[in-house]
Swiss-Prot record:
Phylogenetic placement of the source organism: Bacteria, Pseudomonadati, Pseudomonadota, Betaproteobacteria, Rhodocyclales
Claim: NADP is one of the keywords in the record: yes
UniProt source species: Aromatoleum evansii
Enzyme class: oxidoreductase
Protein name per UniProt: Benzoyl-CoA oxygenase component A
Alphabetical list of InterPro entries matching this protein: 4Fe4S_Fe-S-bd (IPR017896), 4Fe4S_Fe_S_CS (IPR017900), Benzoyl_CoA_Oase_BoxA (IPR017634), FAD-bd_FR_type (IPR017927), Flavoprot_Pyr_Nucl_cyt_Rdtase (IPR001709), FNR (IPR015701), FNR_nucleotide-bd (IPR039261), OxRdtase_FAD/NAD-bd (IPR001433)
Disulfide bonds: none
């Protein structure tokens, strides 16, 4: 996604924090494009040379190298500026916008198109929460993908369920692939289409937290539904989804990304998260929930409330594991629309049933709302918010812009 027009000349400048740099020379030695140099005071990064490859990030013993500021492409921080610093310059209003590293590849057209569709419900991409971690974006492109190895693939839904949803684990070995909760990756199916052209990449949300599906491993997981019919119910075969669902342990996969710099979770203690999803829209919610679960012992506070819709329990990804989570950790509200003998119940119905709680969270500046799933769910969820606000004497149409301006409202529907 590009910056707004008035900020179209933004670039993400890579810098080194002089306060914590120990001048060990590791970054300069490892940089493959000679973008790092130094004088007697500071180590600095050449703006016009750095391509954002991140080869220097992991080896740095202090983390000084992992510093970034948004700047105008025409007036970046010069080498003379950097040599003179005792500490990094303060962040500015420019740092709230999305920007790419100068010299880094542009986002693939299909990624931009999918993102525009997914975020249309909120009026375009929102800002990331103020406490979100810095995301790395577009490190690997269709022209230069990374190869991952499949280390796991198992079906999440029952064998007799109408939806065939798989949990896929990909390992990147020793090659850096930093990813955050809420980000996506691209997978390039092998072969060519009917016109003889390579298949386009397909984006999938990451379903694991930043430290890996297996903690402290360089891997991640995906939640993928096998596509066997189109939106009208006509038989079709999704090229990418069938390829991914059929992967075997040990198979090699071409991956691009990561993608996404705004659909990110808050990190500050006391922050709450309301999650609303259907089907494979549960992937980013699982990532955020697992991130919080692994940090439960820190007692950082903040609530997790989940509204999760599916046709039936056997078609709901992660239904079993979700039921085992402590109720004091997460407040789960299921909605099933195709259970025999039961009335149809959709995710917006579950939201209305929790009107008091939902309104409380909408009013809480420390609560962040995330919606992900089918495009068809979006209108019903927003109407439920509107009805709840109206019943409480508030105006949803006035509240939503406030949520967006505070980076508290995030929508990705397809």
């Amino acid at each position: 996604m590009n910056a707004p027009a008035e900020h179209a000349n933004l670039a993400r400048q890579h810098l080194i924090d002089p306060e914590i740099c120990i001048r060990c020379n590791t970054c300069e030695e490892i940089c493959p494009v000679d973008a790092i140099t130094h004088d007697s005071r500071n180590y600095v990064v050449k703006f016009e040379t750095c391509n954002g490859c991140l080869a220097c990030i992991s080896p740095c013993p202090t983390g000084a190298i992992d510093s970034w500021r948004n700047v105008d492409k025409a007036t970046p921080h010069s080498l003379a500026d950097q040599y003179s610093w005792d500490y990094l310059p303060d962040t500015t209003e420019l740092d709230q916008f999305e920007a790419t590293v100068m010299g880094a590849a542009e986002l693939p057209a299909e990624v931009q198109q999918i993102t525009e569709v997914a975020t249309a419900g909120q009026g375009g991409p929102a800002m990331a929460p103020w406490s979100a971690s810095h995301p790395y974006v577009n490190l690997y492109t269709p022209a230069n993908p990374i190869t991952a190895t499949v280390t796991g693939n198992y079906r999440l839904t029952a064998e007799d369920a109408s939806s065939d949803i798989h949990h896929i684990v990909l390992d990147f070995g020793t090659t850096p692939f930093p990813v955050l909760e809420g980000q996506s990756i691209g997978i390039i199916p092998p072969g060519v289409d009917e016109k003889g052209k390579p298949h386009l990449l397909r984006m999938y949300s990451v379903a694991s937290p930043r430290d890996g599906e297996r903690p402290h491993y360089n891997n991640l997981s995906l939640t993928v539904k096998r596509v066997v019919e189109d939106h009208e119910g006509n038989p079709t075969r999704g090229v990418a989804s069938n390829y991914v669902c059929d992967l075997k342990k040990g198979d090699k996969v071409q991956v691009t990304g990561p993608y996404g710099s705004t659909y990110l979770m808050p990190n500050h203690p006391g922050s709450s998260i309301m999650m609303i999803c259907t089907g494979t829209g549960s992937a980013p919610m699982r990532a955020m929930t697992e991130r919080r679960r692994r940090r439960m012992d820190r007692k950082e506070g903040g609530e997790l409330v989940l509204f999760f819709g599916a046709r039936a329990p056997e078609e709901l990804p992660y239904f079993g594991p979700l039921q085992k989570l402590p109720k004091e950790f997460i407040d789960i509200n299921f909605a099933f629309s195709r259970v025999p003998g039961e009335p149809k119940r959709y995710v917006q119905d579950a939201i209305r049933e929790r009107a008091d709680k939902v309104f409380q969270m909408l009013q809480d500046d420390n609560c962040y709302i995330y919606i992900c799933g089918l495009k068809g769910m979006e209108a019903g969820v927003l109407e439920a918010f509107r009805d709840i606000c109206r019943a409480k004497g508030a105006d949803w149409d006035a509240l939503r812009p406030q949520l967006l301006s505070k980076a508290r409202f995030h929508v990705e529907t397809y």
